[in-house]
Regions:
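Small-residue helix/turn framework positions
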Residues: 61, 66-68, 123-130, 160-203, ...
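Broad, structure-driven detector of short, well-ordered beta-strand segments within folded domains
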Residues: 85, 110, 140, 144-150, ...
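Non-cytosolic head/periplasmic domains of membrane-anchored proteins
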Residues: 107-146
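Short, solvent-exposed loop/hinge segments that bridge or flank secondary-structure elements
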Residues: 132-145, 264-282, 396-417
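N-terminal Sec-pathway targeting helices
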Residues: 1-15
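N-terminal glycine/threonine-rich, aromatic-flanked beta-hairpin/loop signature
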Residues: 143-168, 276-297, 411-431
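Terminal hydrophobic membrane-targeting helix
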Residues: 19-115, 153, 173-181, 206-208, ...
Length: 504
């Protein structure tokens, strides 16, 4: 019996020596190479690491240094200086499910094509990592990333898994070509739904904070978004700048606040923008709203040749359309003020009270072509219920027939200036007068005009002007039918006979 006991003891000692020898060999470069080769040859993955380290002071942790891991024939999914694997008793029943995995000082590539990791963890921790998502819907590049994912159960094309809590911070991040720094994200993933409970970042010399949710169908719900002191320059036109909003099924905005921000593009700019938007849903090129509100003001707004100073806009949204409570701006040296409503069903813009004062406006060279060009689908008609003008200067520099009207005043009622997407004077009445005018180099004084329009005819009951020592007076009627039949009655007293030659 003593001999058998001694043999068992020797066998046990030999086994322990082999185990400890194997244990220490695994922590050498030779052991690391053999483990890496074994994994690469017996699986669809490639794995390399320099050293495997285990310390009795932390017996449940396994440390791998200078790790590269990925799918065979594809770029590496993970490159890390250190991978700390926390083991637990679960390895007895689920060897590939560990307690924690800490990735430190490396890069993690996330894309739809990324193969699933063959292991999972109760918690994935990132420390000073870089994240990239080449070829994915969200073009993401982040550096100095810290945080965690709980639990971490990666699947094909979903490195973060189907259901997890997320808390991440990044020193710098670029998402779809938009850079940001000091980024903080807290939220969760539930299959195809992403909940962002906290989003914060410094971007464009300002700050962004918000709460948002991405639904399974790809639509977004922004509960709260604040932009402060943004200074953003873009190389995109205004339509291209907002184009991403039309690529999602819908964007529901609960509350959007923009404070003291400036944005600039190739042919557009807005400075010192303050904006507050409530309860608006954008769906492709349309919108819906229940009790929505918009308040906006800025120091300057530029879009092409349009240049507005100190614009103020207050509006309310409803299923029926837009109630324009206030719009005022300084434009071309003067002031424009109006209020009214846009009706969704008829696509009609009805302005209750419009006032234009002190303008010094030169018509664009192609204003006649613009007058004939059909207007967008959303503007079927435009009606000025009440209109007034005061001390305006209007100039046309057309070399064939230049003209200028000085100190133009006027008023009108129920003027329909757009019908079936076409400019015109389709109904209503107006009276215009000025201190002086020049038509094709012929000076006149105190020109005045009174007209009344209906569905069939534009009647000019008074058209007069002083020239030289005489006066010109006329009446006219212009048919609204396509033939545009015109009748004119002209009287002149004390005017030269050749005064009309300059007018053709």
């Amino acid at each position: 019996m003593k001999l058998i006991g001694r043999l068992l003891l020797y066998v046990l000692i030999a086994c322990l020596v082999v185990i400890f020898g194997f244990y220490f060999l695994l922590q050498t470069r030779w052991g690391a190479d053999h483990v890496s080769n074994w994994v690469s040859e017996n699986s669809g993955y490639h794995l390399t690491f320099d050293v495997m380290d285990h310390r009795f002071s932390a017996p449940s942790h396994l440390l791998l240094e200078n790790v590269t891991f990925g799918r065979d024939g594809q770029p590496a999914t993970l490159v890390a200086k250190t991978v700390d694997i926390g083991l637990s008793i679960r390895q007895l029943t689920a060897p590939l499910h560990v307690d924690t995995i800490l990735l430190q000082d490396g890069t993690l590539n996330i894309s739809v094509q990324t193969a699933p990791f063959p292991f999972e963890a109760d918690r994935l921790q990132l420390r000073n990592m870089a994240l990239n998502s080449p070829g994915s819907e969200w073009r993401l590049s982040a550096q100095r990333v810290n945080g965690g994912v709980m639990p971490w159960r990666p699947e094909a094309g979903r490195v973060l898994g189907n259901k997890a809590q997320i808390q991440l911070s990044a020193g710098s991040l670029t998402l779809n070509d938009v850079p940001a720094t000091n980024v903080l994200i807290e939220g969760s993933i539930d299959h195809n739904q992403v909940m962002l409970n906290t989003v914060g970042a410094d971007m464009a010399r300002g700050a962004l904070t918000g709460v948002a949710r991405r639904n399974a169908d790809g639509s977004w719900v922004v509960e709260n978004l604040r932009l402060n002191d943004i200074r953003l320059q873009s190389d995109k036109s205004l339509s291209e700048f907002f184009a991403p909003l039309t690529t999602v099924p819908s964007l529901q905005i609960g509350r959007l606040e923009v404070t003291d921000s400036s944005l600039q593009g190739p042919d557009w700019a807005v400075t010192d923008l303050d904006l507050s938007l409530r309860n608006l849903t954008l769906r492709k090129e349309d919108w819906q709203s229940q009790e929505g509100k918009l308040s906006m003001n800025a120091s300057e707004f530029i879009y092409g040749s349009l240049h507005l100073l100190d614009p103020i806009l207050n509006a309310e949204f409803s299923p029926q359309g837009v109630a324009l409570r206030q719009f005022t701006t300084r434009w071309e040296g003067g002031m424009v003020r109006t209020s009214g409503a846009w009706l969704r069903e008829s696509k009609a813009l009805i302005l209750d009270d419009t006032a234009i004062a002190g303008l010094e406006y030169t018509l664009p060279e192609n204003w006649k072509q613009l007058w004939m060009k059909p207007l967008p689908d959303w503007l079927n008609s435009l009606t000025l219920k009440k209109f007034s003008a005061s001390r305006n200067l209007v100039i046309d520099i057309d070399p064939a027939f230049p003209w200028q009207i000085t100190a133009l005043d006027g008023y009108g009622a129920n003027l329909e200036l757009v019908q079936h997407h076409q400019w015109g004077v389709w109904s209503g009445n107006a009276t215009l007068n000025a201190a002086a005018a020049t038509f094709n180099r012929v000076d006149v004084r105190r020109p005045s005009l009174s007209l009344t329009a209906n569905a069939s005819t534009v009647n000019i009951s008074d058209l007069s002007a002083f020239t030289g020592k005489g006066i010109l007076e006329a009446t006219a009627s212009v048919s609204q039918l396509p033939q545009r039949q015109t009748q004119i009655s002209l009287n002149g007293r004390g005017v030269p006979m050749d005064v009309l030659q300059q007018w053709g």
